[in-house]
Amino acid sequence: MSVNEQKKQLRKALLQKRKLLCDSETAVKNAAITENLLSLEKVRTADIILPFVSTDGEVDTREFITQCLKAGKNVAVPRCIDGSNMEFCVIHTFDDLEKGMYGIDEPKKSCAVIDAAGAENSVLIVPALCFNAKGFRLGYGKGYYDRFINGYKGY
């Protein structure tokens, strides 16, 4: 079996396992993750926070985004611009979002695009199905974040 086939099977198994989590367990885990992120010095001192907007059972990033906005942080979230790339756009509220490619909430066209890859004092929050002990991630298979991370200069 090829590596790509193994990844595909692992993605399927992880998505099924994630669906089995009960709402109360998910809420507790989401709150803990949000609290942990907000306590990180890199997050507290970053000029720009680059989170993903959660969907379909992912770790809920909306409370994290809300707290960052309340703290006066610059928050920019991704928008898919074609079949393989994304750009980050500044948002001020969740009203700045609309359904985009793949049915995921993305910034409206009116939101300012920033050079997120070149933003050295920034923190990128990356979606994943899992990470291994060495920090390697398994995403959803489209490669958007893999391509972005290659040129990213922040944390």
Describe each model-derived feature in a short phrase.
Residues 128, 134-155:
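Membrane-associated lipid acylation/remodeling enzymes share a hydrophobic transmembrane-juxtamembrane segment
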Residues 2-120:
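N-terminal active-site beta-alpha-beta segment that forms phosphate/nucleotide-binding
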Residues 107-111, 127, 151:
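Mid-sequence acidic-hydrophobic segments that form the walls
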